[in-house]
């Protein structure tokens, strides 16, 4: 019901349109990974067609990965939290505002079934979330309640927050420390098989971003890619939006470091 009310509200409509449009783009890029079937994707897009935002802006002018990704991320959302375990096929968004809420979208389900509000006091009382984790979440999403979903999905988020990856990093990795796509071979040392994440800061407003099908790569690999991008941006960025969903970055890195012998087109 909260989602339905927000969709009809003039203030929140633009924000939701932007967020949901970005979600469509995100899901579309991951159908091959089995997160959602093409049939369900079409049904989902039909439901949201009336509130689609304007197209993603041209990013061919961007000099590096930071600028390119920043141009493509949501400006309205202070935080986005995705389900940590891919097979659950659920996505959680945290919106800005006085009364933020999280919405989960699951395959073959009505999105409105997955809307709930949980206040920060309740979140703080949960176990096994550590004080450190809560502190980091609070600092990343200032002046906004850390809103998550109750029940099953909340447990999955808690599971993720206690993976070896976050335990091994006292602070969440900043955007300049990583690229958000890679291959398991490159991040094998990071621990848990469910550790598929990236954390970033966008512009002057830090944003927590946990992406279920992405793996963090090492800083040397990321630096190498940035050098390639800066030295010959026209060759790397062949067209606007080429790396919008990251698949071409992944292909390039896999080829460059000998994981895939086939040169990307």
Predicted ranges, named:
Residues 180-186, 216-226:
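Short regulatory "switch" loops immediately downstream of catalytic or recognition motifs
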Residues 219-265:
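…primarily DNA-binding HTH/wHTH and HhH modules…
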